[in-house]
Design a protein with these regions (language model features):
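Glycine-rich active-site loops that engage anionic ligands at enzyme catalytic sites
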Residues: 2-329
């Protein structure tokens, strides 16, 4: 590990370690006087980096290091809140580096991973209403809005036949929650099965309105909006609440945030009327969220990726052709 805390070129970088023994490089950055940000690997979408981050996060929690207040995992980084009067930055860096080095090879990792099933009304009345407002007040010629929705555009951009095939792709894969952020409890999810890894450009400009519970996609990332807010993801539907600071439903009794990093999410299709009823049941406490404990065996997952490589490449070619002939917002 190279100590850069006295360097003049970039005082934010305190130390770094090169890639070695199959492990990615690590960069340790100062994030103020109470936080250390550790970034791993290159700036690319690689879920194995997230698996390593979640493994490190669990190791740090289990170690109960005196002075560590909280750990916050992200896609390929981890933010550590610490008390520098108890734990100097250099000592914290050594702890993190040692625990990261002690992790097993990524193919031997097992990540605690709950399975959560959520209902979704695709092309629903609430997101359509906000899309209509966008056309009226923000951008009348937005190419990502076709027939009053974003799904037709998403299907076109990914080289799919129509909206129904796009919806089938969304429901065909589990979605890996790599991290929570941006708003309280907002999950950043990526498709476990790359054969269904749809990608979509963001709104341009962004929307002033997005309904709470809206499901959106930008790039390869799917997110659920925990609160009504502005947004730039293409809206494909709406689901039940995933954040409840009032903790009205038993699913939120221990934590007002439903989803945690490492969860796997699948969607079932419902209509608007069904969703209204389900949301009412969530709020009165009678709805039972479908949550099952589980574990992701990373080795088995990597073997599965290898077995579907040709199918994945075929979809990416089809996807690329769709993107080439589709305008970007």
């Amino acid at each position: 590990m190279t100590d850069r805390s006295n360097g003049r070129s970039n005082k934010a970088i305190l130390a770094d370690t090169p890639a070695r023994d199959g492990r990615p490089k690590a960069v340790f950055r100062s994030a103020g006087d109470r936080f250390l940000l550790v970034e791993f690997g290159e700036m690319e979408l690689d879920l194995t980096l997230n698996f390593r981050v979640l493994g490190l996060n669990q190791a740090l929690k289990d170690a109960k290091i005196d002075g560590v207040v909280e750990t916050i995992p992200a896609l390929r980084s981890i933010l550590i809140h610490y008390d520098s009067t108890v734990l100097p930055p250099a000592a914290l860096i050594r702890h993190v580096d040692n625990h990261f080095a002690a992790l097993p090879p990524v193919e031997n990792l097992s990540i605690p991973s709950r399975r959560i099933t959520l209902p979704m009304a695709f092309n629903d009345q609430w997101t359509r209403a906000d899309i209509a407002r966008y056309v009226q007040y923000i951008r009348k010629d937005a190419p990502n809005i076709i027939n009053g929705n974003n799904i037709d555009y998403a299907a076109m951009y990914n080289g799919l036949r129509d909206a129904e095939e796009f919806i089938a792709y969304i429901m065909a894969t589990e979605w890996w929650n790599a991290a929570n952020g941006f708003f309280p409890g907002l999950p950043f999810m990526f498709p476990i099965d790359p054969r269904y890894a749809v990608v979509i450009p963001k709104y341009n400009p962004t929307r002033p309105w997005t309904p709470e519970g809206a499901v959106g996609i930008a790039g390869p990332c799917l997110a659920i909006y925990p609160v009504a807010s502005p947004g730039g993801y293409q809206m494909i539907g709406r689901t039940i609440p995933i954040y409840d600071p009032q903790q009205r439903n038993p699913a939120f009794a221990a934590n007002p945030i439903l989803m945690q990093p490492g969860d796997r999410v699948t969607f079932t299709r419902v209509n608007d009327d069904d969703l209204v009823e389900l949301r009412e049941r969530v709020n009165d406490g009678s709805y039972v969220y479908q949550i099952e404990p589980g574990v992701l065996d990373v080795g088995e997952y990597l073997q599965h990726l290898e077995s579907i490589k040709e199918e994945t490449q075929a979809f990416r070619r089809r996807q690329g052709e769709g993107a080439e002939r589709t305008p970007v917002p």
